[in-house]
Amino acid sequence: MTLILGIDPGSRITGYGVVRDTGRGCVYVASGCIRTGAGELPDRLQIVYRGVREVIQTYGPVTMGIEKVFMARNADSALKLGQARGAAIVAGAEEGLEIAEYTATQVKQAVAGTGGANKEQVQMMVMHLLKLTTKPQIDASDALAIAICHAHTRSSLLPHGLGTARSRGGRLRL
């Protein structure tokens, strides 16, 4: 049984979700949001970095899935999102986690069965798959969806001898 961390990065709110992959599905462990509040970007990135490390040290996942940067209409927002991703990736790499990246479409496809699912549909499927009785915050729900996607991807690759190689920086390339 593998503990998996999912990260939905953001420069203001970073969602996290931890699931246990039992081989027959995922079991909910924890989820929440790292809120950076107002402040200068370097300070907010440090909060993301420290928050992700704290989650890793608290729950002990061995692998992490994180959402890839999407093309945003606002270049400044995309850059800030990329920097928040970087802070989370460095935190995971420093803790020795294997790290895989997924597009939003891949996550939606894995969890809801369609890459065009909206946030509410993904949230409802996360609740169903993890047998949750209350709705997680939307950023935490997205992070749980990323963790579920990572569990599904790992389980489909590992029997074929794939998904275990590590490249520079401990990042798992799929």
Curated annotation (Swiss-Prot):
GO cellular component: cytoplasm; Holliday junction resolvase complex
Binding site for Mg(2+) 2: 67
A GO molecular function held by the record: crossover junction DNA endonuclease activity
Gene Ontology terms: biological process: DNA recombination; DNA repair
Coiled-coil segments: none
Subcellular localization(s) per the UniProt record: Cytoplasm
Reaction(s) this enzyme catalyzes, per UniProt: Endonucleolytic cleavage at a junction such as a reciprocal single-stranded crossover between two homologous DNA duplexes (Holliday junction)
Enzyme class (EC, first level): hydrolase
Keywords, in A-Z order: Cytoplasm, DNA damage, DNA recombination, DNA repair, DNA-binding, Endonuclease, Hydrolase, Magnesium, Metal-binding, Nuclease
Cofactor note: Binds 2 Mg(2+) ion per subunit.
Catalytic residues as annotated in Swiss-Prot or TrEMBL: 8, 67, 139
Cofactor(s) essential for the protein: Mg(2+)
Residues reported in the UniProt entry to bind Mg(2+) 1: 8, 139
The organism's place on the tree of life at top rank: Bacteria
Function: The RuvA-RuvB-RuvC complex processes Holliday junction (HJ) DNA during genetic recombination and DNA repair. Endonuclease that resolves HJ intermediates. Cleaves cruciform DNA by making single-stranded nicks across the HJ at symmetrical positions within the homologous arms, yielding a 5'-phosphate and a 3'-hydroxyl group; requires a central core of homology in the junction. The consensus cleavage sequence is 5'-(A/T)TT(C/G)-3'. Cleavage occurs on the 3'-side of the TT dinucleotide at the point of strand exchange.
Similarity comment text for this entry: Belongs to the RuvC family.
Protein name in the entry: Crossover junction endodeoxyribonuclease RuvC
Organism: Pseudomonas fluorescens (strain ATCC BAA-477 / NRRL B-23932 / Pf-5)
The organism's taxonomic lineage, starting at the top: Bacteria, Pseudomonadati, Pseudomonadota, Gammaproteobacteria, Pseudomonadales
